[in-house]
Regions:
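Anionic group-transfer/hydrolysis microenvironments
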Residues: 31, 40-42, 61-63, 106-109, ...
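Acidic-basic catalytic patches of nuclease active cores, encompassing PD-(D/E)XK
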Residues: 1-30
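Conserved catalytic cores of phosphodiester-cleaving nucleases, focusing on short active-site segments
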Residues: 20, 39-47, 51-71, 75, ...
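Domain-level recognition of nuclease-like catalytic cores that cleave nucleotide substrates
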Residues: 93-130
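Structural motif
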Residues: 36, 55-57, 100, 117
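Short acidic/glycine-enriched loop/turn segments that link adjacent beta-strands
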Residues: 34-38, 113
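Mid-chain, well-packed structural core segment of small domains
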Residues: 68-101
Length: 130
């Protein structure tokens, strides 16, 4: 049985996935598990005329409002470190020559019968990424 918070998170991930697909992203992985950590979405995009992939590790934050800050502001340094560890694990199994990587945050705000998306590409950088 899922809690209300878990159901909200799953709904937000579904909304974020659809939003990304409509903007030309392909989803490579959903809820990639690395022990107790996970990556919500792993998405890729290939720009016209190029063969290299841009791979984004997407953290989805779903909220009812921004009263306590934007969704991106809720991804603190501890969460960033966890995401980096999971990303390294994903890369070790899925690396392709020419891939570039980044961390994005998709904020999904649901409330009042509407949905608002806040997309933050390159939301944060990590020095020792590979």
């Amino acid at each position: 049985v899922l809690t209300d918070r878990q159901e909200l998170g799953i709904k937000g991930e579904w909304i974020a996935e659809r939003w990304l697909k409509l903007r030309g992203w392909a989803i490579l992985d959903r809820r990639f598990r690395d022990g107790h950590r996970d990556l919500d979405l792993v998405a890729c995009k290939i720009e016209a005329g190029k063969s290299d992939r841009l791979v984004a590790f997407v953290e989805v934050r779903t909220r009812f409002s921004t009263d306590f800050g934007t969704p991106a502001e809720t991804v603190g340094w501890k969460k960033q470190r966890e995401l980096a560890r999971s990303a390294r694990k994903w890369i070790s199994s899925n690396r392709r020559s020419g891939d570039t990587y980044r961390f994005d945050v998709v904020g999904v705000i649901v409330g009042g019968g509407s949905v608002q998306i806040q997309y933050v590409p390159d939301a944060f950088w990590l020095r020792q990424f590979g």
